[in-house]
Amino acid sequence: MNSINELLLIYGSNITKIKELVLAGANVNYVSPEGLTPLSCAESVEVAQFLLSRGADVNATNEDGKTALFSVSNVDTCRFLIENGARVNHVNNKHETALFYTTDMKKIRLLVEAGCDPLVRSYDGKRHYDLLAHNQKVSFINFLANRKKKMETVNAPLALAF
C-alpha cells in the first residue's frame, strides 16, 4: 500500500490521519483491489461521520456488491451508517445481506431490528438463520422466536379484523 487512497484504509480509527489524507486529496469513495473502501474500514462513528461529510457514499458497493455495512464490525458505527441511509436489505452478488457476514449478536439484533430480513436466501439456498442454527447460536434463535411472538401479538387484532 503506497497510494494516498490506500493509506485511508489502514487508518480506520485514526481520525487525525484520515482528515490529513482527505485534505491532501484522498478519494473517500476509493475501492481497493481487495474490495475495501474507507467507509468499510471505519472503526468509529467519528471516522464514518467525517467520511460521509466529505461525500462518501454510504451504499457504495465493491465489485462483489458489498457495502460498508457488510464489513464494519463496530455496532455503533453500523447504527450510524443505518441512521444515515445504509440499506439493511441490500444484497451482494451472491444475494446475501450484511447478516451473512456477522455472528455478533449485537450487530445481528441491530440489523434485524432495523428491518434486515434474516430469512433471505442466498443464491446457493442458504439463509443466515440456517447458518447460525447450524452453528448452535441459540441466542439468535431465541431472539428471532421472541421477535416473532412480539410481531404476532402486535398483528393479532389486525388478523382478527379479516
Feature roles, as predicted:
Residues 1-34:
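N-terminal segments that cap or nucleate solenoid repeat domains
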